[in-house]
């Protein structure tokens, strides 16, 4: 999911390289990484394998940077095992890493190919997280739509959610700028 809503988010593409040297060699973004993903120390210690992926976030449409194809973020050697840890005990789970660090996307899950390979499950003895993952996948964001300004009734409906002081504690609310003086007065008076 794009952190920038609307059409701006449609400019984003996420590319994921699996732990496969052939896929890595053919991947458009291989020069942004030192080596192909493989098996993390965490998975190796549990006798599991092939849990690492590389993730890049790209300004595919050029709307964010002005240049199509600009790599915005890189996440090397992150794991698809949900319990993956680095040597210092911090998480190395791809979903956690992306969600904590990305300025452009929020990762809600894995596609069906990765889910079928065990993405999002814990690393257990004998797990091989890469069966069938033979090429990089690109996920281009779509369906974002720009919205117009909120109407007076939409603003009032939103503020109504905060009216019961016994249910919701709010110190203050700020009225948005409205298109006309009459609308502004209506919103301010409702507060």
Question: In which residue ranges do the predicted regions lie?
Answer:
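Surface-exposed assembly/interface segments
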Residues: 1-191
